[in-house]
Amino acid sequence: MSETTTVPPIETVSEPNPFIVFATVATIISAFIGYYFLQQSKKHTPVLKPDEFQKFPLIEKIRVSHNSAIYRFGLPKSTDRLGLPIGQHISIGATIDGKEVVRSYTPISTDDQLGHFDLLIKTYENGNISRHVAGKNVGEHIEIRGPKGFFTYTPNMVKSFGMIAGGTGIAPMYQIITAILKNPEDKTKIHLVYANVTESDILLKEELDNFAARHPDRLKIHYVLNEAPANWQGSVGFVTPEIIDTHLPKASNDTNLLLCGPPPMVSAMKKAAVELGFQKAKPVSKLGDQVFVF
């Protein structure tokens, strides 16, 4: 009798489905990316609280004129951001002579600045908060809450901005200008008329002129002085309808006019704007108004 040989079964190994492998890898990568950006967003935590004053330390004071300075305040962590939309402002509060005093200021820094924020403040003889801040030494704190305001800038929201600023009224304009010019996808044109008493009163002039030199097709600046030196290239006196008509864009549906400065100046500019075809400014400006007063 012959012997029969049993052949053991051969195990077959199936090839992995490439589509399943790809889907698995893609899922893992997507999960990792999502986790990464979640952690990054947590790192850059906005710290402002609209209904609660918080203390922030003064970390640097940069003198920019005889009565104005940039005050840099630290955030809790170097990866924190203030949490202030472009065009809005904060409130500084203090107890002065037994009374609670609150004033609004717009930082000149933008919200992508991490670890600190900058305020440009002019010290007035009768300005309670401005003197309060000016009297602070590095390491001392001020109390701030926010954000506040009805204007929030988004890229390309209009074709062009006409801006009229007086003195420290340059602060919200500077913040908006910075946000526009640092974004290569933002095609907004900016025309700024900036008024001051003397040439030494022009705040952030070097920074503004550098912006204009680097972006001549996007930013135009015209300076106006009450007291001008010899060979002054700008206008002399007050901002007039003629100056506005010459140096700012014409009224149109895709042009907004932004105003910020001393109350008498702003009042005169609102009247001039109407003469030039802009809509009458409302008592309280809101986003979407053709003429917005900060």
From Swiss-Prot:
InterPro entries: CBR-like (IPR001834), Cbr1-like_FAD-bd_dom (IPR008333), FAD-bd_FR_type (IPR017927), Flavoprot_Pyr_Nucl_cyt_Rdtase (IPR001709), FNR_nucleotide-bd (IPR039261), OxRdtase_FAD/NAD-bd (IPR001433), Riboflavin_synthase-like_b-brl (IPR017938). Pfam families: FAD_binding_6, NAD_binding_1. Keywords: FAD, Flavoprotein, Membrane, Mitochondrion, Mitochondrion outer membrane, NAD, Oxidoreductase, Transferase, Transmembrane, Transmembrane helix. Pathway: Protein modification; peptidyl-diphthamide biosynthesis. The chain crosses the membrane at residues 18-38. It is found in: Mitochondrion outer membrane. Disulfide bonds: none annotated. Residues 51-154 form the FAD-binding FR-type domain. The keyword Cell division does not apply. Its cofactor is FAD. CDD domains: cyt_b5_reduct_like. The keyword Nucleus does not apply. PROSITE patterns: FAD_FR. NADH-dependent reductase for DPH3 and cytochrome b5. Required for the first step of diphthamide biosynthesis, a post-translational modification of histidine which occurs in elongation factor 2. DPH1 and DPH2 transfer a 3-amino-3-carboxypropyl (ACP) group from S-adenosyl-L-methionine (SAM) to a histidine residue, the reaction is assisted by a reduction system comprising DPH3 and a NADH-dependent reductase, predominantly CBR1. By reducing DPH3, also involved in the formation of the tRNA wobble base modification mcm5s 2U (5-methoxycarbonylmethyl-2-thiouridine), mediated by the elongator complex. Belongs to the flavoprotein pyridine nucleotide cytochrome reductase family. Monomer. Component of the 2-(3-amino-3-carboxypropyl)histidine synthase complex composed of DPH1, DPH2, DPH3 and a NADH-dependent reductase, predominantly CBR1. This is NADH-cytochrome b5 reductase 1. It comes from Candida albicans (strain SC5314 / ATCC MYA-2876) (Yeast).
